[in-house]
């Protein structure tokens, strides 16, 4: 656990990406899933995997391959050629619950009396420790430390008393508390499920006579598929050759209770994705325009910290009239500092990830736009880099509000004491990162960013849609009582 004074431990961690596919013509899907995972690589860089099965072959035979590293590091052409099957699921992972090991890589494959299921999960369950203990008391033996295995066990258990695989998925999901976007393959069906709050994105696509369920629309574009629609919060969708797309909305909540993670629009998702009908790129442009209106400053250049700061920087430029320009060269072969599990890895990444174009900033007053400041390392280092390259002033603008509270739903913000904004004023943060001025996006602007969609902003406000646990997102219990302020809004 990072101590209170280690605000320079860098920013957040999220998350995972899922991609499932069923080809009704019987064509192999492993290679297409591979390209889909490539498009989702930004959602997780620790491990990845693919599991496929042949619906015309023996019921329950699943071929699975997974490993640590990036998609192109784990899979070789010979791996994909051996994976014969017309239905399958893939996953890219960052560990928000459970350690970063090959055993915890997904998809999970579970053999049980009704056959075999493969599961990929994005999110975090706040009641996973209790559910896990309940299963262990009934004889379950876990092979991983991740909450996703709890989901798989419950689906298998519920299948014994259900008429169908999709009913088992729905009944299992009704036990879960937290965030989840699931893709599950049964021997003859592709199933997707999204939690009732809609924390994590999930959508459906179609290519020729095949269907896809995946985290982001950019993955559909990559494989030449057509977007069909989003999976709705609380929905279980089932795809089969006999019935096409079926929908079960039993778990759906009233729309005003939905709680999409706003950080998908601010940072997590690729800018070329659309989530619940809203363009991620357009949202970031709006954020930049709002910053220019609410936190103006005289300057010569507006620039974004690649990649997620670029669109907001362009929006700031459009609204302010200050020229937009490129000030950073990014090393494309270094993963995001956001998605590095160890502090030593994060700091090394910051040092080699970016270089400043001296010709672009020397002698200029620079406005630097970034998506967030969580612990502070990246902002502090980049401000110094700009000054070393000759910038006369560095004004930092952040396209999100200050992070003040932990997240329990799949984003690694484990303790308030680790957050640079905890018990500090904006002026104090500005001094710590070495900027001439600092401005954050106002909390009231977030819903406008998401075009009025119901969103969740608990990491900024401390208001949760459900009672938070006395544990961090990696399952480590706190001894102290949870602050009253942290509790959900009534």
Over which residues does each language-model region extend?
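Secondary-structure transition/capping motifs at alpha-helix termini
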Residues: 140, 161-162, 296-300, 318-325, ...
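Extended, hydrophobic alpha-helical segments in both membrane/secreted and soluble proteins
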Residues: 302, 309-316, 320, 324, ...
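PRPP-dependent phosphoribosyltransferase catalytic core
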Residues: 173, 188-189, 224-226, 230, ...
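Flexible loop/turn segments at secondary-structure boundaries
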Residues: 96-97, 127, 191, 199-200, ...
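Mobile, glycine- and charge-enriched loop segments
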Residues: 355-369, 373, 398, 474-481
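Conserved short alpha-helical segments that host acidic/polar catalytic motifs at enzyme active sites
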Residues: 1-233, 238-299, 305, 393
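Short, glycine/charge-rich flexible loops or terminal/linker lids adjacent to PRPP-binding catalytic cores
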Residues: 321-366, 376-377, 404-412
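A conserved beta-strand->alpha-helix junction
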Residues: 144, 149-152, 324-335, 432-450
């Amino acid at each position: 656990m990072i101590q209170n004074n280690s605000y320079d431990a860098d920013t957040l961690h999220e998350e995972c990406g899922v991609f499932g596919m069923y080809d009704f013509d019987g064509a192999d899907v492993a290679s297409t899933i591979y390209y889909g995972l490539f498009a989702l690589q930004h959602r997780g860089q620790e491990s990845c995997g693919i599991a496929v099965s042949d619906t015309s072959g023996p019921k329950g035979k699943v071929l699975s391959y997974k490993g640590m590293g990036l998609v192109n590091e784990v899979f070789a052409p010979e791996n994909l050629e051996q994976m014969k099957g017309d239905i399958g699921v893939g996953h890219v992972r960052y560990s928000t619950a459970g350690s970063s090991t090959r055993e915890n890589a997904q998809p999970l494959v579970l053999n049980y009396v009704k056959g075999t299921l493969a599961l990929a999960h994005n999110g975090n369950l706040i009641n996973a420790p209790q559910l896990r203990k309940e299963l262990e008391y009934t004889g379950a033996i876990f092979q991983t430390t991740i909450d996703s295995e709890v989901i798989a066990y419950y689906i298998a258990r519920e299948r014994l008393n259900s008429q169908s695989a999709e009913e088992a998925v729905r009944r299992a999901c009704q036990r879960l508390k937290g965030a989840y976007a699931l893709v599950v393959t049964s021997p003859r069906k592709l199933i997707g499920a999204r939690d009732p709050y809609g924390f994590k994105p999930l959508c459906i696509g179609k290519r020729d006579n095949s269907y896809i369920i995946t985290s982001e629309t950019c993955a559909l574009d990559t494989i030449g598929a057509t977007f069909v629609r989003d999976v709705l919060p609380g929905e279980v969708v089932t795809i089969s050759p006999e019935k096409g797309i079926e929908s079960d909305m039993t778990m759906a909540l009233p729309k005003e209770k939905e709680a999409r993670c706003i950080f998908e629009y601010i940072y997590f998702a690729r800018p070329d994705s659309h989530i619940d009908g809203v363009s991620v790129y357009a949202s970031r442009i709006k954020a930049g325009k709002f910053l220019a209106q609410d936190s103006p400053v005289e300057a010569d250049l507006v620039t974004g910290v690649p990649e997620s700061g670029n669109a907001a920087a362009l929006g700031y430029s459009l609204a302010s009239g200050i020229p937009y320009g490129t000030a950073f060269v990014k090393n494309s072969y270094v993963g995001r500092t956001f998605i590095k599990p160890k502090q030593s890895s994060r700091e090394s990444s910051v040092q080699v990830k970016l270089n400043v174009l001296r010709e672009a900033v020397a002698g200029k007053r620079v406005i630097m736009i970034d998506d967030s400041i969580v612990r502070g390392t990246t902002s502090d280092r980049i401000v110094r880099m700009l000054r070393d390259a000759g910038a006369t002033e560095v004004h930092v603008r952040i396209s999100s509000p200050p992070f003040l509270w932990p997240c329990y739903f799949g984003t690694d913000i484990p303790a308030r004491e680790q957050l640079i904004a905890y018990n500090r004023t904006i002026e104090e943060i500005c001094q710590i990162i070495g900027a001439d001025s600092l401005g954050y996006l106002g909390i009231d602007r977030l819903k406008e960013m998401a075009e009025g969609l119901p969103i969740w902003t608990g990491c900024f406000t401390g208001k949760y849609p459900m009672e938070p646990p006395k544990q961090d997102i990696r399952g480590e219990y706190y001894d102290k009582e949870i602050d009253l302020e942290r509790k959900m809004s009534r």
